[in-house]
Amino acid sequence: HGVPYMINTIGLGYNVAKVTEALGADAPLDSWDLLFKPEVVEKLASCGVSVLDSPSEVMGIALHYLGLDPNSESEEDLAKAEALMASIKPHIRYFHSSQYIDDLGNGEVCLSLGYSGDIFIASDNAAEGVEINYLIPKEGAATLFDFLAIPGDAPNPENALAFINYILEP
């Protein structure tokens, strides 16, 4: 058994001013095209683009963007996702699973593929006057659920239960 603790999504965080400046009024601010269209992400390379260092999640997103099963293990499907990632890689500043939290807020990058909670932290910590938005693309996004559970062989199940009860208090 488990108790739902937190919901997260994986989407795009972006610096509104820098992305608008780089792409103009026609920026696809509602779509994965912002990251996965080479001609779009190329224009953002100068202000910095980061991607999660989480191959299983990123490849699933790439597969979904291509209209394929995000859980596909087909060599043909994975080759298509690999080709998509290779097409944008020259425009990616780095792959990392936490550095973007600070970098998005302080202007080191203008677009990050990341976890919603991290991007909201970046927005909260952003320099004064810097607007960071979070985008769940119209094509859809991955949703993650964290659960609290007590293993059957936990050495202190009473303490674990007390902690879970504490966390669940409003």
Segments from the language model and where they lie:
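Short, well-ordered amphipathic alpha-helices
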Residues: 34-36, 119-122
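Short, electropositive, low-hydrophobicity segments enriched in small/polar residues
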Residues: 71, 111, 118
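Solvent-exposed loop/turn segments at secondary-structure junctions
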Residues: 10, 18-20, 55-58, 117-120, ...
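Extracellular/periplasmic catalytic domains that process cell-envelope and extracellular macromolecules
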Residues: 1-6, 41-44, 105-106, 126-128, ...
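Extracytoplasmic/periplasmic substrate-recognition and gating elements
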Residues: 99, 114, 124-170
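Extracytoplasmic ligand-binding site segments that recognize negatively charged/polar headgroups
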Residues: 1-91, 96-105
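Paired acidic/hydrophobic, glycine-rich loop segments that form the ligand-binding mouth/hinge
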Residues: 93-94, 110-115
